[in-house]
Amino acid sequence: NEEIKELYPFLSHEIEYIYNPLDCNNIIEQGNENIEKMTSYEKELIESDYFLAISRLDAVQKDFETLIEGYSILKNKGIKEKLYIIGEGNGRVKIEKMIEEKNSGEDVILLGEKKNPYVWMKYSKLFIHSSKYEGFGVVLLEALMLDKFVISSNCPTGPTEILTNPKAGELFDVGDANQLAEKVLKVLYDKDYQKELLKNIQLKKKEFELSEIAEKFHKIIEESM
């Protein structure tokens, strides 16, 4: 929204923006999939305490270096949660090397592609997104639909728009692993703050419901007639 206004300042007072709706019910339904159908290994993993990232394994754009460094800082501070990463890509070997260099092989697990990532999202303690840039960042919304706490880089474009007004998650500066770790600890251990975030997450979810989007379309059509 803000980027469009910057490109066309002379039209800023006339711009109306409408989000694409999300199929919230489908996301929730897949998140509630019966884990008893999983292999014993998958079931053991999903029943553990873990943070989750879902991303194409692109070491540059997705900035796995910051993600893995931030997680290493958290481990040094004593957290017990593991880090699972869902996705595949040509950066896998480079990312595996990053994990090895941090001696995190037992704690950072590359799960590959998953037919249903939402059930893994549902069971995670929080969702981390470390990209240097994004088109919009729909995966952040998908995490919110499952009432997950979200920690995201403040990258262009999307995260700020998704996680603010009201504040529905935490943002850290792109490439700042220390700040990433600080934000995770804040969300992980501040129970009062968790309640505040959950309240705001419910408000944010409504913005992307089909009924809400349809109402905005209806209003714009009426005003233009």
Please identify what each model-predicted range represents.
Residues F51, D63-G70, L83, L180, ...:
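A structural motif in glycosyltransferase catalytic domains
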Residues F149-S153:
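Short hydrophobic beta-strand element within catalytic cores of glycosyltransferases
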Residues D58-I73, N90-E96, V138:
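A conserved mid-protein helix/loop that constitutes part of the nucleotide-sugar donor-binding site
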Residues N165-A177, K186-K191:
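Conserved acidic donor-binding segment of nucleotide-sugar-dependent glycosyltransferases
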Residues N1-Y17, L22-N26:
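A short, active-site helix/loop in glycosyltransferases that binds the activated sugar's phosphate group
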Residues E113, K132:
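Aromatic "clamp/platform" in nucleotide-sugar-dependent glycosyltransferases that forms part
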